[in-house]
Amino acid sequence: MNVSVVTERRTPAYSSLAAGELNGLVARALLTEARLTPKPGLVDIRNSGAHRDMDLAAFERSTTAIAPWMEKFFIMGNNTAALAAENVLVMLRPLGMACENDMLQATNGVNTHRGAIFAFGLLSAAIGRLLARGEPLEQNRICDQVARLSRNIVAHELSARKAGKLTKSETHFQCYGLSGARGEAESGFRTVRTQALPVFNRVVQEHDDTHLALLQTLLHLMAWNDDTNLVSRGGLEGLYYVQQQAQKLLWQGGVLVEGGIEAMQFLDDELILRNLSPGGSADLLAVTWFLSHFPAGSLYPE
């Protein structure tokens, strides 16, 4: 059995965070997710999942390329804290595009982290805004700022009828009502806050095992997240198949019962055969690990 065990103890919650520290925390989040094994259909230590154009080394190179950009997102958020949040997104886009270019250069043109750049760019800018305003760094405040930065992004970018061929994201929304990464950001990472973090925290508390907590959390994300990466590869049938298989494993106890890891490996093999990769859930898992390093805070920040 070939699995990667995450043995790192959870670090104390951050009450403050320098821009340079943010780069390191994001890099650790991305590498923790990438190296977690076994992950059904995803790149990990065991194999390259349903991907023929990337491997773990590509994810590690990509992380090295994009992590330094988080400081730039942080600074932009910090410098524009006096502006209405919805007016800042347009200023973050050039940073995101430049960061993506560095990723593609590091991976020879392979998209390893486009979704993660979007998520962590917003999170970094949100943290910069909070610190500029003297507000505490708490999960709910950070996510509330992300929601404010992303306000109306689904309506503006996915709902509007445009001339020419629809993008994949527009097709997913206009045909199936799936808003993908944009919808998750606009909701302030609702799936992470209401599903992933509670599972992660509970398993860590009950089992003192970050590796098991991350795998169990991934299963929950695969079971309930409407992952548009799966729709791109296998249509709604592919999405529903993965959700049903993950739910089945959870009903059996997931990775917390005997044989759970082997069941994850079997599902990995099945998703590879079907060319299915839950990349959106992988991004949310990295976000979950990242946010777990901050206190939860009040549910409704002022």
Curated annotation (Swiss-Prot):
Pfam families: CitG. GO terms for biological process: prosthetic group biosynthetic process. Its EC number is 2.4.2.52. InterPro entries: CitG (IPR002736), TriPribosyl-deP-CoA_syn_CitG (IPR017551). The keyword Metal-binding does not apply. It catalyses: 3'-dephospho-CoA + ATP = 2'-(5''-triphospho-alpha-D-ribosyl)-3'-dephospho-CoA + adenine. Keywords: ATP-binding, Nucleotide-binding, Transferase. GO terms for molecular function: ATP binding; triphosphoribosyl-dephospho-CoA synthase activity. Gene3D superfamilies: Triphosphoribosyl-dephospho-CoA protein (1.10.4200.10). Belongs to the CitG/MdcB family. HAMAP family: CitG. This is Probable 2-(5''-triphosphoribosyl)-3'-dephosphocoenzyme-A synthase 1. It comes from Salmonella typhi. The lineage of its organism: Bacteria, Pseudomonadati, Pseudomonadota, Gammaproteobacteria, Enterobacterales.
